[in-house]
């Protein structure tokens, strides 16, 4: 394995130049660098891929809330066991945007051009991730079919300040025996461009939460990967003045073929135990509903019954009943939900229709 990795690393270091650009501004942020820069393999069976290097997300002064770049990943992922993404946000002397901002990382589907959210996080108040040696960690193995070869990534932060946030992102690609050699992923729903571009909660809306999914006939395992975070302080409050959807604890349900099958508990995560505990004077310690400032937003995995293989079944994402009385703004749930199909034979992506 060591010889294989040395050969692969040498090939990647000979790759050309990539660029990072801001996509919300006419003034691009350009960064010339090697596609794979300064490989750091923590173990013999791990390859480290450097991607964004001190790129800034900001607003105003010709700056952009997002940055894009093209990077070279290993072409063959059949022996990749796991892929971990690490997001470092440095904020020396509290010089960054001091608020807890919604942020995420995307990979572009090379065929369709659609951006897939591979990880979401909420920035800490006032500080960066310096207390975590490698920053925030997110398992992105489910997207390994897209994290191969020349790969486009995007990082976004819902900041409204010119001082913004600065990021470096790298990936540990761990080789070994995967559970299945092949996998494919496709979004079921993505209402996640920002905290307030999510699904309105407690009022009528036109966003589709019902879909039909068809799994390939050679699927050996399939599951849903869902990321959810709520925003807003809408009333009526729950006990303890918990407004929706940032603070109100709720249970969401996924119905498969019209039967309530999976539940997502949006409750306390223990925000006060966050190792990034230097966020004062920010209000970081109280528990939100399913997320915390300065942490990655959890991904929720729901394994589908094997009897669904090769068939078309219905999917519906359902909220707990509650009505916004309109006296304190709106409530939103930013949601992305993907279906992943795995097999030991080459597999195509599941098909999702309305």
Swiss-Prot record:
Catalytic activities: Hydrolysis of an N(4)-(acetyl-beta-D-glucosaminyl)asparagine residue in which the glucosamine residue may be further glycosylated, to yield a (substituted) N-acetyl-beta-D-glucosaminylamine and a peptide containing an aspartate residue
Biotechnology: applications noted: Widely used for the removal of N-glycans from glycoproteinss and glycopeptides in laboratory.
Signal peptide annotation: 1-40
Domain of life where this protein originates: Bacteria
EC number(s) on file: 3.5.1.52
Short name of any one Pfam family annotated for the protein: N-glycanase_C
Keyword Signal (UniProt): yes
GO molecular function, one term: peptide-N4-(N-acetyl-beta-glucosaminyl)asparagine amidase activity
Mutagenesis / variant outcome for changing residue 158 to Q: Loss of activity
Cysteine disulfide links: 91-96, 244-248, 271-292
Active site: 100, 158, 246
InterPro entries: Cu2_ascorb_mOase-like_C, N-glycanase, PHM/PNGase_F_dom_sf, PngaseF_C
Keywords: Disulfide bond, Hydrolase, Signal
Misc. remarks from the entry: PNGase F binds primarily to the polypeptide chain around the glycosamine junction including the inner di-N-acetylchitobiose core on the carbohydrate moiety.
Subunit structure: Monomer.
Record function comment: Cleaves an entire glycan from a glycoprotein. Requires that the glycosylated asparagine moiety (reaction 1) be substituted on its amino (R1) and carboxyl (R2) terminus with a polypeptide chain.
Protein name: Peptide-N(4)-(N-acetyl-beta-D-glucosaminyl)asparagine amidase F
Organism, as annotated: Elizabethkingia miricola
Gene: ngl
């Amino acid at each position: 394995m060591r010889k294989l990795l040395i050969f692969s690393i040498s090939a990647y270091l000979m790759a050309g130049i990539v660029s990072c650009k801001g996509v919300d501004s006419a003034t691009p942020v350009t960064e010339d660098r090697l596609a794979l820069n300064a490989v750091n393999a923590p173990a013999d069976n791990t390859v480290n891929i450097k991607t964004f290097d001190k790129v800034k997300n900001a607003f105003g002064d010709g700056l952009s809330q997002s940055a894009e770049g093209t990077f070279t990943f290993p072409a063959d992922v059949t022996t990749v066991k796991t892929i971990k993404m690490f997001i470092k946000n440095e904020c020396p002397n509290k010089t960054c945007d001091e608020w807890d901002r919604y942020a995420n990382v995307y990979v572009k589907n090379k065929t369709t051009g659609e951006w897939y959210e591979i990880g979401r996080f909420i920035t800490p108040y006032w500080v960066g991730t310096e207390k975590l040696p490698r920053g925030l960690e997110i398992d992105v193995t489910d997207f390994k079919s897209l994290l191969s070869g020349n790969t486009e990534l995007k990082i976004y932060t819902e900041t409204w300040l010119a001082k913004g946030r600065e990021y470096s992102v790298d990936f540990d690609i761990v080789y070994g025996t995967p559970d299945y050699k092949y996998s494919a992923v496709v979004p079921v729903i993505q209402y996640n461009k920002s905290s307030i571009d999510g699904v309105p909660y407690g009022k009528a809306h036109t966003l589709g939460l019902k879909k039909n999914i068809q799994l390939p006939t050679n699927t050996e395992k399939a599951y849903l990967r869902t990321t959810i975070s709520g925003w807003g302080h809408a009333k009526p409050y729950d006990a303890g003045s918990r407004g929706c959807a940032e603070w109100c604890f709720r249970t969401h349900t996924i119905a498969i073929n019209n039967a309530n099958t999976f539940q997502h508990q949006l409750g306390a995560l223990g925000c006060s135990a966050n190792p990034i505990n230097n966020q004062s004077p920010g209000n970081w310690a109280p528990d939100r509903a399913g997320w915390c400032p300065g942490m990655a937003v959890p991904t929720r995995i729901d394994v589908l019954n094997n009897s669904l293989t090769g068939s078309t079944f219905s999917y519906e994402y359902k909220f707990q009943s509650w009505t916004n009385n309109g006296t304190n703004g709106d409530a939103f749930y930013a949601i992305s939900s993907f279906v992943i199909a795995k097999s030991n034979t080459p597999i195509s992506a599941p098909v999702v229709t309305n």
